Amino acid sequence: MHAQDKDFHIYLAFGQSNMEGNARVEPQDSIGISERFLMMSAVDCPERGRVKGEWYKALPPLSRCHTGLTPCDYFGRTMVDNLPSNVKVGVINVAIGGCRIELFDKESCAEHIATQPDWLKNIVKSYDNNPYAWLVDLAKKAQKDGVIKGILVHQGESNTGDKEWPEKLKGVYENLLSDLNLKAEEVPLLVGEVVHADQKGICASMNDIIDTLPQVISTAHVISSAGCPAAGDNLHFTARGYRMLGARYAETMLQLLGYKAMINKQEATRMKLWYSAPARRWVEALPVGNSRLGAMVYGGTD
């Protein structure tokens, strides 16, 4: 498969509700989106004028018609802000709230779905009862347009305590690489932590398992959720939490692509690159792209 445009970087995303997008989209999330940040609609969405398998400007929601803000939103925004102006970024998001990693097992997903509650079965129907195959089909279509550069995952809450989870995710990753004729060293796996213990995350113990992934998958990179604000259920992130987490996915990916993705706080202060309304705490600051410097600058207050 030969890509039509090597400067169109495509990222596959899958997982459960935090990748699907649980927070309400706020006004700021639908403005200032670059024409270089695109999403491939994973399903038909007539009310938004979207057709499955077609590219659109990445206005949220990026999963299905009525989902919310996702890490993909600010992953893509941050990427295009920091990549050369000739590079476009596209995301394909197939995520199902409440699912276990077993739902993406290409060999046994049918048996797994049979054991699940009706509400999950109804969501899975949107993906023809096989989200893995659905994602692969979309990815193959996308490969006619650009180059798959990475795979983003946020899943684990429904597998909390499952010590075999890293191996199960490894199987999904390796299947994707094989089915799409990709090389692991060219397509890293970026996996976000669930809501952190510092936010009283009810599944925070799963992060101990997630953090072992690089020992199982040499091309896996764990994205910290520390400090990312949680919603009242302590299971999902707030909109601000998704913005922060998405930017962290991008920071890691930019580094892997060879870009200096962050400069230190003192230099950021000296350069006076700030938002008009500074973050209340440094950890809340979001990246300000500077493609010419090849850097991602954070502005905020202590």
Which residues does each predicted region cover?
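Cell-envelope and extracellular/periplasmic
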Residues: 4-261
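Aromatic-residue-lined binding/catalytic grooves and analogous aromatic/hydrophobic interfacial grooves
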Residues: 263-302
